[in-house]
Design a protein with these regions (language model features):
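TRNA-binding/sensing appendages of the translation machinery
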Residues: 10-36, 44, 315-371
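Nucleic-acid 5′ end/cap handling module spanning
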Residues: 2-31, 35-36, 40, 148-253, ...
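C-terminal accessory nucleic-acid interaction domains of nucleic acid-metabolism proteins
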Residues: 107-110, 211, 219, 254, ...
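Active-site palm subdomain of RNA-directed nucleic acid polymerases
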Residues: 457-468
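SsDNA-processing nucleotidyl-transfer enzymes
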Residues: 1-4, 58-59, 81, 88, ...
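Histidine-centered divalent-metal-coordination microenvironment in nucleic-acid enzymes
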Residues: 431-433, 466-487, 522-530
Length: 607
C-alpha cells in the first residue's frame, strides 16, 4: 500500500498522522522458515542490512507467541526522532563488500521503523482498519517492551512509528527537526497490496531555492537549472513536474526563441528566466524530488547565488528576513552572522526545550565582538506579534517557545541565552544546577575535580546528573527535578550540603568565600546562585568570548583532566551533535524518576 503525494493537506478528525521517514520501504516476515526483509520491489535487504536479523534472532523466544509475524515499515538510518539520513542509507544500500557491510552494521546500525502489522500469530490483519491494526501493533510493542516511538540512541533496532491525532504539533516537530514530512492515514483504511491509495497521503517538508534556467533537454523536456557560485554557473539539477501545461509550453517556446546554442541533446540559454523550485534535499549535488513552485520575474539571475541556496536549505522560517548575513562576528574566528543563524537552526531541537516557558535574558552583540554588548530583559516594542512574553516583577520578558522566535532573536544578534531555574508555570525549582567557576581557564582542572567529586556523591545517592561546559571557563552540573514538588529552600539544603562536602574534601581547592580577593586560586562554589530569579546560561548557547565558546553538554565519561574549555566552540558543538548525539537527550524524562525526595528527608532530619 502506497501513499499519494499531496500539496494541500486538509486536517480532519478521522485521520491519524505519522512521521514520514526517508529510507527503504520494507516488509519484515518471520515464520518457520526464518526471517526475511524485502523491499517494495521484492528485493532481499538482509544481505546489505544484516543488523536487523542479528538483532532479532536472539529474541526468538520472546517473539514466539506472535509468530508467524509480518510487519510493514521503513528501513532507516535515524538522525533524530523525526528525520532519517537518506544519503547515508543509499550508500549502505550500494555497499557490496562483506567487511564494509559488517563495519557499517556495527558502527551505525539501521533501524526498522514499523508503522503497520499485516500478520500476527499467523492471522492476517488486512481486513482490519488502520486504527485497529495500529492498536494491535502498539500492543505488540508494549508486550515486547520495545520503543513506542523513534529513539536514535536506543539499541533496539525495531521501533514503532507513533500515530498522532494532533497534526499541528507533529508538523511543528517535523519542521523543527528538518524531517522529510508526514503521512496522513484515514482511520478506517484497509491495507491493500501494491495500491497507491488516497486514504494514505504524504505531505512533505519542502525546501525552496531561487535559480535560473540554463538548458532544455530535447528528449524528455527537463529544464536544467543553476545558480551563480563565485561568478560561474553551478548546475544544481533539473525540474519537470509542477508546471501547468500552458506554463511548460510557454517556457519551452521562450527557450527555443532565445537559445544561444544547441547540440543533439540540449538547447542552451543565457541565465535570464528565474524561478523558485521546491525540493527535499541536495543529494549528490542535485536537487532531490524537485517541483516547480513559481516564476520569480522580479529577480535578477545574479541574485540566485549558491550562498543563498545553501542558506535556505536549513528551512529557516519563510517570513523572516536575515539582515546583513555576511557581517563578521568574531575577530579571530571566521564566523559570520549567517553561520551563527545556521548554528541556532541546527541546535534548535536541543536548545529550545530548555528555553520553553522560561523568561529569557539575552546578551546582544549588535556589532559582534567588535563592539559593546548589552543585556536585554524587556521585550522591545518593535518585536513582531509572534514573539510571546511573560510579565514578571514589572519586566515583560520574552518567552522563546519556537524556532521562529529563536531565529528572530538570532537576527537581533542575541548571542547569549540565560534562563532561570524554573518555568513560568513552576511553583518551585525545576532543577538544581551547580555552577563550578574557577578563577581562570588555567584553573579549569579545579572544575573537573569538583565535577568528579559531585558525580561520586550523586551515584552514591542514586541521583541522576548531567554535565555541560559553561562556554567560558567552568563546568555546570544539572539535576532535573519533577515540577511543583521542591521549593528553593529545599534545594538550598542540598546545594549547601554539596558545597560543604567539596570544601571538606579539599579546602585548598574549593571555597564558598563571597569576596573575590579572599578566594585566592580556589574554585568558588556558588551554591547561593541557585535561587529564584537567578539565571544560568542555556545548553548550546554561544558565549561572547574570544574563543566563540558554547555551553556544551558532555557525557560523564568525557569529564577528565584532559578537558579544556577552549575546545568547545560552535564548530565542535555541531560536530558532536552529528557524531555523538545529545548528552542531555534523557534530561526531561529523568524528572519523573529523580529520587531527590528521600535525600531531602535525610538532610532535613540532620538540619
Amino acid at each position: 500500500m502506497l501513499p499519494t503525494l499531496t500539496f494541500d493537506l486538509t486536517i480532519q478528525p478521522d485521520w491519524l498522522y505519522e512521521v514520514k521517514y526517508d529510507g527503504f520501504r520494507a516488509i519484515l516476515n518471520w515464520d518457520d522458515s526464518g526471517i526475511t526483509l524485502t523491499s517494495r520491489n521484492n528485493k532481499p535487504l538482509l544481505p546489505q542490512f544484516p543488523e536487523i536479523k542479528d538483532f532479532l534472532e536472539p529474541l526468538e523466544k520472546l517473539f514466539q507467541p506472535f509468530l508467524p509475524l509480518q510487519l510493514d515499515g521503513e528501513l532507516v538510518l535515524l538522525e533524530n526522532p523525526y528525520k532519517a539520513n537518506f544519503s547515508a542509507i543509499q550508500v549502505r544500500g550500494r555497499t557490496k563488500a562483506a567487511k564494509k557491510i559488517a563495519e557499517h552494521a556495527a558502527k551505525s546500525p539501521c533501524r526498522l521503523m514499523v508503522f503497520d502489522i499485516l500478520v500476527l500469530a499467523g492471522r492476517p490483519q488486512h481486513s482490519k482498519t488502520f486504527d485497529e491494526r495500529k492498536a494491535r501493533l502498539s500492543e505488540l510493542f508494549n508486550q515486547l517492551n520495545f520503543p513506542l516511538e523513534a529513539d536514535p540512541y536506543s539499541e533496539n533496532l525495531l521501533q514503532l512509528v507513533k500515530a498522532h491525532k494532533d497534526f499541528s504539533k507533529l508538523w511543528e516537530n517535523v519542521v523543527l527537526h528538518d524531517g522529510e514530512g508526514i503521512i496522513a492515514k484515514q482511520k478506517n483504511s484497509l491495507w491493500e497490496e501494491g495500491k497507491r491509495s488516497l486514504q494514505w497521503l504524504k505531505y512533505k517538508n519542502w525546501k525552496y531555492v531561487s535559480c535560473f534556467i540554463t538548458a532544455l533537454e530535447k528528449t524528455n523536456g527537463y529544464f536544467y537549472v543553476g545558480v551563480y557560485k563565485e561568478g560561474t554557473i553551478q548546475g544544481i539539477g533539473q525540474v519537470l513536474f509542477g508546471f501547468k501545461p500552458d506554463e511548460k509550453q510557454a517556457l519551452q517556446s521562450t527557450i527555443k526563441q532565445n537559445m544561444v546554442r544547441e547540440d543533439s541533446q540540449f538547447i542552451y540559454v543565457e541565465p535570464a528566466i528565474c524561478l523558485e523550485i521546491k525540493y527535499l534535499e541536495l543529494y549528490d549535488n542535485q536537487l532531490r524530488e524537485p517541483h516547480f513552485h513559481r516564476f520569480r520575474f522580479e529577480l535578477k539571475p545574479t541574485e540566485c547565488t549558491y550562498e543563498q541556496f545553501i542558506f535556505k536549505q536549513k528551512n529557516l522560517p519563510e517570513d523572516l528576513d536575515i539582515t546583513h548575513p555576511d557581517k563578521p562576528l568574531w575577530k579571530d574566528h571566521d564566523i559570520q552572522k549567517a553561520d551563527f543563524i545556521l548554528y541556532l537552526r541546527e541546535v534548535s531541537p536541543y536548545m529550545l526545550p530548555f528555553l520553553e516557558n522560561r523568561i529569557l535574558t539575552v546578551i546582544r552583540y549588535p556589532h559582534g565582538m567588535f563592539g559593546e554588548p548589552f543585556y536585554q530583559k524587556n521585550c522591545p516594542d518593535y518585536a513582531p506579534d509572534f514573539v510571546k512574553t511573560h510579565l514578571s516583577e514589572g519586566i515583560d520578558y520574552i518567552v522563546c517557545n519556537n524556532l521562529k522566535t529563536l531565529i528572530w532573536l538570532g537576527n537581533q544578534l542575541a548571542i547569549e541565552y540565560h534562563i532561570p531555574f524554573q518555568t513560568i508555570h513552576s511553583k518551585g525549582a525545576s532543577e538544581i544546577v551547580f555552577d563550578l567557576d574557577p578563577p581562570s581557564k588555567e584553573e579549569f582542572h579545579l572544575a573537573v575535580k569538583a565535577a568528579l567529586l559531585i558525580k561520586e556523591v550523586l551515584d552514591q545517592l542514586n541521583l541522576i546528573g548531567f554535565v555541560k561546559t559553561s562556554g567560558n571557563k567552568g563546568l555546570q552540573i544539572y539535576l532535573p527535578l519533577p515540577e511543583n514538588v521542591f521549593t528553593f529552600e529545599d534545594t538550598r539544603l542540598f546545594t549547601s550540603f554539596i558545597a560543604d562536602y567539596l570544601i571538606s574534601k579539599d579546602p585548598d581547592s574549593f571555597t564558598t568565600e563571597r569576596m573575590k580577593k579572599n578566594r585566592g586560586n580556589r574554585l568558588y562554589v556558588d551554591y547561593v546562585q541557585h535561587s529564584e530569579g537567578k539565571t544560568i546560561v542555556a545548553p548550546y548557547s554561544m558565549r561572547g568570548n574570544e574563543h566563540a565558546g558554547v555551553a556544551t553538554p558532555l557525557f560523564w565519561e568525557e569529564v577528565d583532566y584532559s578537558l579544556h574549555p577552549v575546545n568547545f566552540n560552535m564548530e565542535s558543538a555541531l560536530h558532536r551533535l552529528r557524531k555523538q548525539g545529545d548528552p542531555f537527550k534523557n534530561y526531561f524524562q529523568t524528572k519523573s524518576i529523580q529520587s531527590f525526595g528521600p535525600v531531602l528527608e535525610v538532610l532535613k532530619a540532620k538540619k
